[in-house]
């Protein structure tokens, strides 16, 4: 972020703070008792004992000593009329004097008119006040947010179970000054400037408003150059349009700069504050603030002539407006410190008002709320047998389905139903015979807006009108005469109704209704409340308690919010996040974590801050055996040539990495090392000037600062790395790595000296490359129960997620604890098999428990994730089933903590944790535990013993090696490689390929000569043998592996002519042991695995999934091993005749994962041929056996060795196109000369090649298999059985 927005943001915040301080300073002593001096008539109630409400003042002892209703039940209330609108800052209560009657909890509602009540809330929750525990003590509550009202009601929720409801009350506050203007929807106020144009660099506009209409302009101003500012109600929300000096933008074609609020057409006061400094602006509606940057080219707002309030009048056309005017009341309207309404009341010349009055007219509207989807209903009487029927009302809801109206027509002739189904109105009329008709109208009527419904019927014609639409359809009912009935059920039906007076084919309605008319007569809902009209169940009368659960939007990371009356839901599709509120990232935080989960190389999305605000970024993870590299590409990694630039017009290239600078900084800061390769070529072009002069080329990094140093050197010096080391090979080339993390990544390169004759330069900036996760292995050890780490307070009001690894041998201990005044959070291991997550957000303590079937104090790493949001609380331990608890639909939901976060202990220094904790995340933020442990007694940085937990990740004989940060897998004694020894090493063998491993010296198979397990001595006869190999071939018979013992004894693994596996042991001249595995033909171009192990005389053979066992005779003596051969045995002297048959064509196919005891001969040949006792003859090509399974096997029949420049023509194929002419002689001469020339060249190449690699006879190639591979796969040679020496054969 540049410095200007930072400065303007600070100024905006300062201005906002001063503004609010000014407002609160006027009410500094607003705590006077307001009820003590009220007359008895100011007190009223839902019901009372004789005159009890008039003696309900605090500390009052007269009369009955306080208020008690006739019966203690729900929906009772005590009301105070404070005479005028006042500011209420506190309340206090007592029980009824000298009794056992008191209220233990209650809520407050307030109103300006005594109707259309509003519930007192904190945040988005209806606030419950703690009441009394006896009759005489006073319980005082300071309101977190002051309210302004004339009427206030105390509504008891719970009371003494051994008594009744009893209350004495007091209200504290002060006088409230208010300037009000009433707009009738056809008028406006004009504030005219003293000069033509009002130009402002900063603005503060504040007001309050109330309205029953969802649309209307509150204020507007514009200038001739495109400046404009407009605040407009749109569907019950406030849209702000603000533009600075952009003539292209027009109000009708631009989108709002900000939209805030919801359900603002509820006839309650709503506050608005707009603060602007330059292009930075804060827009606040009812304590919800949105910060934004304005459109436009300048910092000044230029408004011409006037500002209009309440509408946008058309110049020279009085009474004409561009948009719908505002209808309602505006209070305390200030524009840059000017009280606009006060000026209008005093008829100042700057103000023009048309039909604006200065008192707020309050419509006497009584809304009702249907609370319960099963039991809410309202019964109102009709006038029976009137010719026709007329019903109208307004409703608003979030539910798609619900019964709106059910009535039985006069004399039981039929039924009329009005249903909301799938957000559409459905009118259904049936007669007693079952004939019916229906009408559908509207869609998405569950959008929370007020909708008006009017049903008019006369005789055989019914009309349903929605939202005053004149094009509403009419229904004809020739089979039914419609007459008004006795009863009208709104919202639902009573449970005890047994006849057809009320039918409900769908669930009850949840929502609000108002303005109910039956037979063109309004219904008095206050009379319903008092019990003198109709009947009801589970209604809130005289208030609409609709709540927009999607505002503010608690779906994080762009999740889409939908809602019903009681709940909201988040659609997290295409966000990269999951969970009830789209809080949890589906991606890992680094390549290290992907590696830990078993991934190797590929493109991955990395979310550096987890559940934090930063979006995931795509990177390339390359997991090698020693480092895990993370690569981020940018938009120009190719070599780029530059000409024609100079200091006045330099060449500039901006680099785009596909993410924000915040994302890149998080990746870099979380890595151990980062680098970018920089290459610069030049000709007649300077890179640097003098060591102190201005450079001709430079680059900028993350903070937009110039950096004149280049690859391999240090920040601050105009040098390059090879110049420092005096190793520059070319004067015109500078190549090196930038590795100072605070300056990376390179975001821009500037070159300014390529405009001279024949002058040019070229540059290349490589991708950003990093390795090492600084946090994943960040661990601490707690050695005493009293030790803990201090972390700043965990601020997680709406969402909290905590994750970490731990290991311990203790029986119990507290991992984390954070306290608040009333709230707390604690995570602990309560026993060796139980983890508890305890939390209290104000609704009482709640505990989640996960029980483990295995002990958690086994000194192994275990993972814990605890999460709490406003919808649910969850606890995960390892991969065990999670524990979950849904949040209450109503009640407190803000987690407010104020103490420090204790890690590894508690504030009481008891029940501390003994063991290790690592990789602690708090709402995605990484906590550097090791750094804090350095200055904390009883806590030690780091934790050893990673291999105890993760050693199992090293597979196929790999050995886990402990490191300070994490671990590595040593694959020395494994035929596999890779970070987890999971990558097989395989190669293609041709008919002449032979790999021989000699057991003569204790040669290691890797460069690590200290590993003695990698060799076998020639004079040692192994008591145990283990052989593993995988193969794929289409040739049979063929030899797979040959072990040469002393005295012409051997072990051979081969495929017989029918493709079955055969293992031959020859341990003496007199006797051989032959084991034949009678399975299907294994020469079927599929990968098969052979495992053979011998322990003394016990032999086991596994072919794929089949296992066989055998015992050698006790007199058998096993021989020492001299060599191991894969493929063709080239020294055939003394070779067993049957083995010789299989060896005739060698092995053509693929071998992989070959291992004899701790020897991996194929790995030695392909990876460590220069230091291993291995010899390769013929062509050996590294490849993957699995990739060959479905390959095309119809290739060319000839395979060439790379050491021979020409292949031989197949002897069985005749030559063609032979020319019989006199030119044959000339051609022959040319051929002979050519042949001799190539022979000489071949001898020279062969000689040089032998000088270079004398230990090998042929070249190995590491490449993909060639297209001509499968020529020999088609060869099938029929070898006759030959009599051999006496053998023991075992057919298994």
Curated annotation (Swiss-Prot):
Domain Laminin G-like stretches: 180-360, 367-544, 778-943, 987-1185
Superkingdom classification of source: Eukaryota
Chain segments annotated as transmembrane: 1225-1245
Glycosylation sites: 282, 496, 622, 1044
Membrane topology: Single-pass type I membrane protein
Tissue-wise expression: Expressed in brain.
Protein name (Swiss-Prot/TrEMBL): Contactin-associated protein like 5-2
